[in-house]
């Protein structure tokens, strides 16, 4: 059934994923997706640690699949004995990070709530149906995952192009947000909710009158990069002093080179993205080795850095639900196949922002990497 491009996988193991090595199950799922050009939406797994007042278990083996969109669970409601508040991670949902510190789960959606009453498990379930087709209620990441699978399938149907799993993953993650009423630290948000809960498909495909979305798709050879000068920016987002304002969300999803013989270094390529200001354009000597672009940048500055923003402004934007704190995710030197940044230009501590450029750089152990 290779014509079926989106697959829901609401099953897994009860064994925690390693912090260092990727599981055979997870790597097999990656291989299936590469060989068949399909996308698997995979449950993060459940744990019962909350029934014994223990910390949550990490994602199950198989949920460490790099290519899959791994889904955790949020509480949709709160019963009298449930532990989680509405829009908080469900008590049973497994958490990240994945091996090599990659962000897993990728996203979350509603999968129910649970708690204990005098030693008895109490559940507030999601409506589903049983084998005989009758309505049923239950909890688990097995029930949050199909919601995201449906979104992925709908996107596939509505995007009138050849199926591209990278594009579907990017749309889901780019349009994911953290619940505005959640007060968890940024570290806990990423660990338990990945990049957040995806918006509706209509919101993913059709911007509001206050938004613009650019999608860039290309393949980079080892050691190469792509530069964009004078990045397009609406005049309405330039204030009376000539400074840029507004929110920027940047999502980078790559088809990393994978090598199942390299244990914790399973991801063999990395792409970084820099977005920022520069002083002037300069001429470059293309006769020199490695220089292909006759134009270069003088004093470029990456604005996707925590140090450029005020720590005093916190919380969600009142209209968009936008969370600046995404900027605080530090990817370090690890190879991350998915990276997301969210910034609010009004919170910058420096005022001279005249132009923006976009720069991709590739650091690969092999020949090329898709983005």
What spans do the regions from the language model cover?
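Short glycine/serine- and small hydrophobic-enriched flexible loop segments
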Residues: 109, 149-158, 174
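Extracellular S/T/G-rich loop segment that most often corresponds to the catalytic His/Ser-adjacent loop
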Residues: 58-149
